């Protein structure tokens, strides 16, 4: 059984194509079941976001399975395969596992280190589970992908540096004030950037939020979202002395705040620090206010500089994250080889025990003069010889999962002793279960 990934992303396809290929059906479970009904596909899961559309599948026929999935993706969205094919990437086996782990860890995201993709991947897996299209392969791989992503976030700094303008502004505010709890905020403007900044700020347990905009209704709408208070645009300078943090982003086309105004306001505040964030272009705040003591002004270029520095830090962290991914892949394959070792050991022991028992019975049949005690001694002797002979090779096989040569040892034992553990019957369920696990995941 092989693990496959087929899809496209912001790296390979324009947004127009990503929109057309997006799986946003009213019946996502039905789409998943249609995928697993394709020839050679036994399991299926879809990850569909604004930046990527990927199908994860298990298949006993990788080439045929990929061809079926490619055809399905085109036909389901009313496209010719020729339109789709140049934008697709296809991975199988170890490469597919690496891709999944990198996606889960946000190493393949448009914004390196962003946290949303892991949640989206978990939702996709939950849907596959509830639709009964996740089986042994996905049920083992996805938890390992989540574990890899957790390690990356815990052991690297990949998510610790702001890489959006709105969050960079909050990060700078924290550097100025240390703790934003109880700090009052004024937002001048009601566009998307103001909304994002307000969302980040309100997550810091801030105090009062004042919102102003030329259109009062828009200011009221934004204020309601964050439990704030809207004030008329013409009156906002009167409230500035109450604000510890001021964020401006309007299309005013000129300065809303001058140095003279801020000098008066900082006196009213008795020189308590003010943090001003001007993300408007053209700028809303006179850059000269930076010369006022206890006034800290940052414009869009300052924030972009912070973002670029932080991106460099995330790229450094990504190198360590890639090492973690490789460690997790090795760990997964080590576990996979250990699954094969268990039924192989049982099969080898059974075969040798069958030979020992048969030959011992033959010998004892020709030694009728031996009493019961002598016969037990012969049985014990033959068992001891078998155990001594098998001890060293079985110890090596038990460690097969910890050594890159484990696969070679297992294959050698299989061939030398003509073993086929997957087809052998046992008195218990555990060996059969292990054999099935190995068969499901071998790639």
From Swiss-Prot:
Active-site residue numbers: 50
Q: Where does substrate bind?
A: 49-52, 109, 114-116, 120
For the region Disordered, give the residue spans: 421-443
Instruction: State which Enzyme Commission number(s) the record gives.
Output: 1.2.1.70
Catalytic activity, as annotated = (S)-4-amino-5-oxopentanoate + tRNA(Glu) + NADP(+) = L-glutamyl-tRNA(Glu) + NADPH + H(+)
Q: Which UniProt keywords apply?
A: NADP, Oxidoreductase, Porphyrin biosynthesis
Q: Where is the composition biased (Basic and acidic residues)?
A: 430-443
Where along the chain is NADP(+) bound?
189-194
List the Gene Ontology MF annotations in alphabetical order: glutamyl-tRNA reductase activity; NADP binding
- Which family does the UniProt entry place this protein in? Belongs to the glutamyl-tRNA reductase family.
Domain comment in the entry: Possesses an unusual extended V-shaped dimeric structure with each monomer consisting of three distinct domains arranged along a curved 'spinal' alpha-helix. The N-terminal catalytic domain specifically recognizes the glutamate moiety of the substrate. The second domain is the NADPH-binding domain, and the third C-terminal domain is responsible for dimerization.
Further details from the record: During catalysis, the active site Cys acts as a nucleophile attacking the alpha-carbonyl group of tRNA-bound glutamate with the formation of a thioester intermediate between enzyme and glutamate, and the concomitant release of tRNA(Glu). The thioester intermediate is finally reduced by direct hydride transfer from NADPH, to form the product GSA.
Q: What is this protein called?
A: Glutamyl-tRNA reductase
> What is this protein's gene name?
hemA
């Amino acid at each position: 059984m092989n693990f496959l990934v087929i899809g496209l992303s912001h790296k390979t396809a324009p947004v127009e194509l990503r929109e057309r290929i997006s799986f946003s059906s009213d019946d996502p479970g039905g789409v998943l079941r249609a995928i697993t009904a394709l020839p050679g596909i036994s399991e299926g899961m879809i990850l569909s976001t604004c930046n990527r559309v990927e199908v994860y599948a298990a298949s006993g026929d990788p080439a045929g399975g990929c061809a079926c999935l490619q055809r399905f993706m085109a036909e389901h969205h009313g496209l010719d395969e020729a339109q789709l094919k140049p934008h697709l990437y296809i991975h199988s086996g170890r490469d597919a596992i690496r891709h999944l782990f990198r996606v889960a860890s946000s190493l393949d995201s448009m914004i390196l280190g962003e946290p949303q993709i892991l949640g989206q991947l978990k939702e996709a897996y939950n849907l596959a589970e509830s639709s009964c299209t996740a089986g042994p392969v996905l049920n083992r791989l996805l938890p390992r992908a989540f574990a890899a992503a957790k390690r990356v976030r815990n052991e690297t700094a990949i998510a610790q540096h702001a890489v959006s303008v709105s969050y960079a502004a909050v990060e700078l505010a924290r550097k100025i004030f240390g703790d934003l709890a109880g700090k009052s905020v004024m937002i001048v403007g009601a566009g998307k950037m103001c909304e994002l900044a307000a969302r980040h700020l309100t997550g810091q347990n801030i105090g009062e939020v004042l919102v102003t905009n030329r259109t009062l209704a828009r200011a009221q709408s934004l204020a309601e979202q964050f439990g704030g208070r809207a004030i008329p645009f013409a009156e906002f300078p009167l409230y500035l002395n109450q604000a510890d943090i001021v964020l401006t982003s309007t299309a005013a086309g000129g300065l809303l705040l001058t140095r003279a105004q801020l000098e008066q306001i900082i006196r009213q505040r008795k020189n308590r620090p003010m943090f001003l964030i001007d993300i408007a272009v053209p700028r809303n705040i006179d850059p000269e206010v930076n010369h006022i003591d206890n006034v800290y002004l940052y414009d869009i270029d300052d924030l972009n500089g912070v973002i670029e520095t932080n991106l460099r830090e995330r790229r450094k962290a990504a190198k360590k994250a890639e090492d973690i991914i490789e460690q997790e892949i090795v760990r997964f394959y080590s576990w996979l080889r250990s699954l094969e070792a268990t039924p192989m050991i049982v099969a080898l022991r059974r075969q040798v025990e069958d030979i020992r028992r048969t030959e011992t019975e033959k010998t004892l049949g020709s030694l009728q003069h031996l009493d019961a005690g002598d016969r037990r001694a012969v049985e014990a002797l033959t068992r001891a010889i078998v155990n001594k002979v098998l001890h060293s090779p079985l110890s090596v096989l038990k460690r097969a999962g910890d050594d890159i040569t484990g696969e070679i040892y297992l294959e050698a034992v299989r061939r030398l002793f003509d073993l086929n553990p997957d087809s052998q019957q046992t008195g218990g369920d555990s060996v059969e279960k292990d054999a099935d696990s190995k068969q499901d995941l071998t790639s």
